[in-house]
UniProtKB/Swiss-Prot annotation:
It comes from the Bacteria. Its EC number is 2.4.2.7. Belongs to the purine/pyrimidine phosphoribosyltransferase family. Keywords: Cytoplasm, Glycosyltransferase, Purine salvage, Transferase. Its main location: cytoplasm. Pathway: Purine metabolism; AMP biosynthesis via salvage pathway; AMP from adenine: step 1/1. CDD domains: PRTases_typeI. Pfam families: Pribosyltran. It comes from Latilactobacillus sakei subsp. sakei (strain 23K) (Lactobacillus sakei subsp. sakei). One of its GO terms (cellular component) is cytoplasm. This is Adenine phosphoribosyltransferase. Homodimer. It is found in: Cytoplasm.
Length: 172
């Protein structure tokens, strides 16, 4: 049976501000069959890459990455916001509409030479994923691909990570 994943995405106009259409993956996550099928598609992609570790940024990267890591039998390393990790970290900043934000990872989260898949719910401007990739590489990891439920094409996030393989289930 083939699932049309877009049937499980709620499009909310004018959220969080006028002119923006928010793509809500909550319906996808709340439907066990659809969530499992979406996860399985990313698992299939990851198997072909020889993935040894999944890394995902807070918070929705966890939603995508953790079940993929579980299915593959590999670890998951979170990229967190400030003050969330108790041990020594590396960090990378990225631009926001007004200012910047910073993500952190434990220094031992990724081993040198480890093949890493970076996951998130969606690829928008690419800043979060680019920052996550920067930390993985600083730790010596090899980013073998990126995976998303959704790519928002008009925001050109692909440009920030153009040197990496990109897998997405759907695009808007």
């Amino acid at each position: 049976m083939s699932i049309n994943f877009k049937d499980y995405v709620a499009s909310v106009p004018d959220f969080p501000e006028a002119g923006v259409t928010f793509r809500d993956i909550s319906p996808l996550m709340s439907d066990g069959e659809a969530y499992a099928a979406a996860t399985d598609k990313i698992v299939e992609y990851a198997k072909n890459k020889g993935v040894e570790m999944i890394v995902g940024p807070e918070a929705r990267g966890f939603i995508v990455g953790c079940p993929v890591a579980y299915k593959l039998g590999v670890g998951f390393a979170p990229a967190r916001k400030k003050g969330k990790l108790p041990r020594e970290t590396v960090s990378a900043s990225y631009g926001l509409e007004y200012g910047k934000s910073t993500l952190y990872m434990h220094k031992d989260a990724v081993k040198p030479g480890q093949k890493v898949l970076v996951t998130d719910d969606l690829l928008a401007t690419g800043g979060t994923i680019a920052a996550t990739i920067k930390m993985v590489e600083e730790l010596g990891g090899i980013v073998v691909g990126t995976a998303f439920f959704i790519e928002l094409k008009d925001l050109n996030g692909r440009e920030k990570i153009k040197d990496y393989d990109i897998f997405k289930l759907m695009e808007y």
